[in-house]
Amino acid sequence: MRIISFAEDMRQRGFRPGTEVLSAGLVAAPPDIAEKLEIEPGDELVRLERLRLADGEPMSVEESHLVHRYCPGVLEGDYASNPLREALERDYGIRWLHARQVIRAIPAPGDLARTLSIPPRSALLNIERVSFSQQNTPIEFLRIYYRGDRYALYNELHE
């Protein structure tokens, strides 16, 4: 598998991608995320929460946590119109070398259900991913919550 953007994934599936920024700002790294990003609890993170759309309908919610010192001006970007991944590469020279992720099914809590326009406790596909730069440095911790009724994962497996 290779790392692809939400927009590329949606286009491959025949959807028109869209994005709404729900929130953006600086936060102190909680201990669990700090451990994943190999930083100290309390270090500054950029937190960007986006609603991802497919043909104008909610598909997922993404919570990106980026180590602020590697992308200090990233909050100035317009991530409703421009891909975060492209800004990281263009403005900070950050390209993803690899990522590690955990995938699980979870019931939608009320707040996510409202945002995704689904009944509470509906099935969500939850992905937690740590993405590493070409220097093998963890830069981003990403939580994605996909609607279980609209999204399926496809993998090709080899012996």
Give the label of every model feature segment.
Residues M1-F15:
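Short linear motifs at protein or domain termini
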Residues I4, R16-E159:
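C-terminal all-alpha effector/ligand-binding and dimerization domain
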